[in-house]
């Protein structure tokens, strides 16, 4: 059974702009490997304190089969991907369930 899922994420604790773009490139590769690259937008921004961060979200709900298995897999490889590029960065993945929202 598949469900519609909204994906959003942020990566904070980024050292500088070059590191932020390195994280973006690594996450774009991950999205390609997970076959959702064409459905997820990723970018770099600066918060009010002047710190760089990476954020992204799905352009529309993703149809995921066996989400209960894929979710922990994705969260694990997401965290590992970020850690490989920026060990001190803090990734956060958020899920939305549009079919349950009224």
Feature names for model-found ranges:
Residues 1, 43-50:
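Short glycine/proline-enriched loop/turn "hinge" motifs that connect secondary-structure elements
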Residues 1-28:
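Short, extreme N-terminal segment that most often corresponds to the first beta-strand
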Residues 5-7, 17, 39, 48-49, ...:
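Short linear motifs in intrinsically disordered/low-complexity regions
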Residues 35-44:
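Short beta-strand elements
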